[in-house]
Amino acid sequence: MGTKKNILLGTISIIHSNWLPYAVGCLISHCKSIDQVNQRYHFHEPIYKHKPVTEYHTVLANTDILGLTCYVWNQSYNDELAAYYKSINPAGIVVYGGPQVPENQLAKISYDDKRSWLDTSIAGLGEIAFSEWLLDLPFSNSTLTTMPTPYTDGVFDSILATGEKFKVSFETNRGCPYSCAFCDWGGQSRSKLTKFNVDDVYSTIAKIYDYKNIVELEILDANFGILKQDIDIVQAMIDNQNLKDNYLRISYSGIAKNGSKNLPVILEKIFDNIPIDQRNLKISFQTHTPEVLANINRSNIDNSRLAPLILEYKNKNIPTTSEMIIALPGETAHSWLRTLDYNFHTLGIDYVRTYFLHLVANIDMATPEYQQQHGIQTKTIAIGHQQFEIIHRCNSYNQDELVRMFDYHWFYHTLVNTNLIKNNINNIYKDTLRFFAQLDDMPVLKSLVERNRSLVRNIFSDEPVTTLTNKHHQRFFSASMRTDDIVVILENQIAVAEELSAFVQQPLEVEWLSDNPLSADATIT
């Protein structure tokens, strides 16, 4: 047997430098379970930090194969890193995987051909396909049935031993039975729900809770709570938390989409046992517009099941947050305002968190057929190393309609989400329209609205690529969907209070915050 080849795998996080690289950790864990791979290859410690590519020079110079997990947010950086690797190691091999690699064969050829430094890319679920590629075996398109266990296999031991604070993630199952048009969690290769051995899940949880420098744990399941075993998994986290006196922040990528009889039990355990600052009922709706839900192949939790759940947690003073996507195909300014109104009055949602619609590879919405059907025109937003494809026109909206849609969002996000006039609102729909009809009488707030309109027009302009360099504009697009509006309001408290008092037709009683928050969840009172 000759000298082993060195493999360097990386899942680079652009914004968060302390997320352990779970995706490539799974590849390493799976590959190390195969004797033939161990005989031929050695794996370097996986990389995960976003830093100047030259700082990876030493390890790259000693690498035969560089494998990178590609997402929409790190594709540009991965390209820079891979090109640099080829410049210092021309004989080295670059392989890409991850959600950004197209599964459509023609799109994949185009993706590969644009990158002269790329030797191969592997689409779809990665562990089995990557090991087959390493062993020169034909791709079997097999589905992984055994849970990768990078934590208990020691893949991350050397990284965790540094003592830095880390956020970690893992799956208890894989796949999604739904196929929402905007999401790549479902689809042909990922629509089957694979349940992993629960003992492996328990061992992983126990290992994670052994580390006091792990501060946050995210469950990556698309529909946590869909399986009965999820109740026991939550209990295992609670037991480890109490046994080891290690109170991690717990988050979930996705809660069971259409409700589940297991969900109330799971939420009860979470809310009764996790520290108070971590308690929040988060529900993903995207929209409440029936035509739009049909366009995106999605159905929301039935209100008859949802309303009692929300009421139960309101009675326990547990806030509810709804997650929405603005400007889905079929949405209009009017329908979006109706959606906000429904959240507030019918469901009693405490906070509405809204996201931009990004198009990624391997979703229905990115296919030519879907885009032709809905009259979709796309463009690119560039922020540093990150590039995002967005829709800037479709059958239901043009730029002017988008400006009105974002006007209504601005009103809700700036004045209602912040608690500024939440208690003075009688009817979200009517009060929003009345606010903009009276906007000329509110000079400070009008200046913020006009500034917001200008930014929205810039983002959704017809130019093929718009680069955002202003930090507030970047935050608006990629994080909070607001600039520094809250800061400006706090700096002009007296004038804003007078303007809003006239609008709500009663004195505005506000206990202003002493600092100037910029976060997406910032409140004023």
Identify the meaning behind each predicted range:
Residues Y151-N315, I326:
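Radical SAM [4Fe-4S] cluster-binding motif and immediate context
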Residues A107-I109, L134-L135, D230-I231, V265, ...:
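Short aromatic-enriched loop/helix-cap "lid" or pocket-rim segments at secondary-structure transitions
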Residues L20-V24, N78-D79, K195, D230-V234, ...:
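Conserved strand-to-helix beginnings and helix N-cap segments that scaffold or border functional pockets
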Residues C31, Y84-I88, M237, Y313, ...:
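Hydrophobic positions in alpha-helices of CheY-like receiver
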Residues G2-I12, Q36-Y41, H50, T58-D64, ...:
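Radical SAM enzyme core and accessory elements
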Residues Y111-S116, P138-S140, A236, T339-L340, ...:
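Short, hinge-like loop/turn segments at secondary-structure boundaries
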Residues G2-Y211:
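Acidic, low-complexity intrinsically disordered segments
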Residues I65-G67, Y202, I208-L220, K244-S251, ...:
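Conserved C-terminal portion of the radical SAM core fold
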